[in-house]
Amino acid sequence: MAAGPINPVVVDASVAVKWLLPDEDHTDRARLLLRRYGQAEIQLVAPSHLRFEVPSAIVAATLGRAPRLSRDEARDAIEDFLSLPLHTVDTSELILSALPLVYSNGCAFYDALYLALARSLGAPLITADRRFYQRIQPAPGVVWLGDYR
């Protein structure tokens, strides 16, 4: 019996960061997504700008009065991230469909790109960005990472 198509799941940078920084909330839920991806139950998809957002968040964890990571740890985390076989969609393909989502939801443009991708694929969007999540509620298909099962 042939396996059916793999269900796409859109993840944003707030989820991807949790794969790499162990002191984050809901890392168990984020790692469950990775396990399901590894078992070919889901396909992880994101707009291509995720490739810039995640390293930026990792670098930010090295800065400030109480850095969470050393520079070497940040480099290792970024290398780990770059080795993940995420399927990315060129952000430029999503710009026009994201624009009305910014105005209707009052969210940041880069967040609207994730939402536009999820809607174009008919896929859920999983986020751990509380401000974004609260701003766009109720939004069908948007799942808070802590609620992901």
What is the role of each PLM region?
Residues V15-A16, L50, E93-L94, Y114, ...:
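Alpha-helix capping/helix-boundary segments
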Residues E53, S97, Q134-R135:
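Phosphate- and divalent-cation-binding pockets in alpha/beta enzyme and binding domains
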Residues A3-G4, S83-I126:
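Active-site neighborhoods of divalent-metal-dependent phosphate/nucleic-acid chemistry enzymes
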Residues M1-H49, L63-E73:
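Short, well-structured N-terminal submotif of metal-dependent ribonuclease cores
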